[in-house]
C-alpha cells in the first residue's frame, strides 16, 4: 500500500470534489473536508489543503485525476524508513491479567543505526529478558509517550453499559499517546498505527474523544514488522506491560501469567478462593471468559 501526500490549492480542491463526487464516503475526522474511495484508494482532503491518497493504486489514481504528483511531500510504501515517523502499538489487550500498555514513539532516520545495533524488532519475536534489557535504552534515546491503563480502571471503563468497548478503548489510548507526543513539538512526516480495526471504525470512535490532531494516519497490519517506530513502541509497551503484571502479582502474592489460557483460569480461581472477586477486579479484565472458567473451577 502506498501513501501520497500533496498540497493543493482551492481551485484544484473544487475540481477534485467534482471528479470524485460519485465516490464520496463519510469521515468522522473533524479535520477532513472531503473523503472519497475509488479503485480501492481512499482519498482524504483536509481543511488545511493537504490531500492524502492511501492504497496500492494511489499513484495510478493520482495520474487519472491529473494531480501534481511531482509535488508529493512524500511517497512511502509500508516499509519505508527514510522519513521521520511516529509509530504506536499496544500490548496486553489479549491477556486476562494485567493492564493495557500503549506507546507512541518518534523515530528519525538518524536513529536507525542505533536501533539496528540493538537488534530492535517486533516484541513478539524477542524474549522477555531481551525486551527488559533493550527497553530502558530505547526509553532514554527515543522520544516517546507511554500510557498504561490498569485492570481496575479498565474494568470501570470497558463493558456493557460502560463508556467504552474493547475497540474504542484502544482508539482512545492510541489517540491520546500520539496527541501527547505531538504536544512535545514532534514533527513526523507519517504516523503509523498497528491496525487493530478499520480506518472508518477508528474514526467513528475517535469522534467521541476530546483531543484531536490534524495529521493523517496510516493503518498497517503487523506494522511492527515494517516500521522501526512501531517496533520501538512494541518493545517499550511490552516492557511496561510486564512490569505492571509483575507488580500486580507482588501485590497479591501470586505469579500472574500472561495470556488468556488455562494457566490464567487456574490462578484466577486461586485468587477467588483467597480474596474473592475484588482481587480479579484489581488484576484482571473481568469480561474475559477466564472469569467464568475460574468460578467454575471453584465448584469442582
From Swiss-Prot:
Manganese or magnesium. Binds 1 divalent metal ion per monomer in the absence of substrate. May bind a second metal ion after substrate binding. Its cofactor is Mn(2+); Mg(2+). InterPro entries: RNase_HII/HIII, RNase_HII/HIII_dom, RNase_HIII, RNase_HIII_N, RNaseH-like_sf, RNaseH_sf, TBP_dom_sf. Its main location: cytoplasm. GO terms for molecular function: magnesium ion binding; RNA binding; RNA-DNA hybrid ribonuclease activity. GO terms for cellular component: cytoplasm; ribonuclease H2 complex. Gene3D superfamilies: Ribonuclease H-like superfamily/Ribonuclease H, TATA-Binding Protein. Endonuclease that specifically degrades the RNA of RNA-DNA hybrids. Belongs to the RNase HII family. RnhC subfamily. This is Ribonuclease HIII.
Amino acid at each position: 500500500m502506498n501513501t501520497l501526500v500533496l498540497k493543493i490549492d482551492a481551485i484544484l480542491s473544487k475540481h477534485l470534489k467534482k471528479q470524485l463526487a460519485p465516490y464520496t464516503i463519510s469521515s468522522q475526522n473533524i479535520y477532513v473536508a472531503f473523503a472519497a474511495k475509488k479503485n480501492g484508494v481512499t482519498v482524504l482532503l483536509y481543511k488545511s489543503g493537504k490531500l492524502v491518497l492511501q492504497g496500492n493504486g494511489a499513484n495510478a489514481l493520482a495520474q487519472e485525476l491529473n494531480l501534481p504528483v511531482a509535488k508529493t511531500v512524500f511517497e512511502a510504501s509500508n516499509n519505508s524508513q527514510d522519513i521521520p515517523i511516529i509509530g504506536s502499538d499496544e500490548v496486553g489487550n489479549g491477556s486476562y491479567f494485567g493492564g493495557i500498555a500503549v506507546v507512541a514513539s518518534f523515530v528519525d532516520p538518524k536513529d536507525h543505526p542505533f536501533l539496528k545495533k540493538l537488534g530492535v524488532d517486533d516484541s513478539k519475536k524477542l524474549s522477555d529478558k531481551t525486551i527488559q534489557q533493550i527497553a530502558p535504552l530505547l526509553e532514554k534515546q527515543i522520544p516517546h509517550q507511554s500510557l498504561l491503563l490498569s485492570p481496575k480502571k479498565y474494568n470501570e471503563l470497558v463493558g456493557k453499559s460502560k463508556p467504552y468497548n474493547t475497540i474504542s478503548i484502544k482508539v482512545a489510548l492510541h489517540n491520546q499517546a500520539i496527541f501527547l507526543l505531538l504536544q512535545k513539538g514532534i514533527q513526523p512526516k507519517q504516523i503509523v498505527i498497528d491496525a487493530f480495526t478499520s480506518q472508518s471504525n477508528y474514526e467513528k470512535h475517535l469522534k467521541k474523544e476530546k483531543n484531536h490532531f490534524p495529521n493523517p494516519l496510516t493503518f498497517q497490519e503487523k506494522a511492527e514488522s515494517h516500521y522501526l517506530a512501531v517496533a520501538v513502541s512494541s518493545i517499550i509497551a511490552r516492557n511496561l506491560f510486564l512490569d505492571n503484571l509483575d507488580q500486580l502479582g507482588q501485590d497479591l502474592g501470586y505469579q500472574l501469567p500472561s495470556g488468556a489460557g488455562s494457566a490464567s483460569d487456574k490462578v484466577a480461581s486461586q485468587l477467588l478462593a483467597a480474596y474473592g472477586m475484588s482481587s480479579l477486579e484489581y488484576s484482571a479484565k473481568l469480561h474475559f471468559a477466564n472469569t467464568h472458567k475460574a468460578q467454575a473451577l471453584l465448584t469442582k
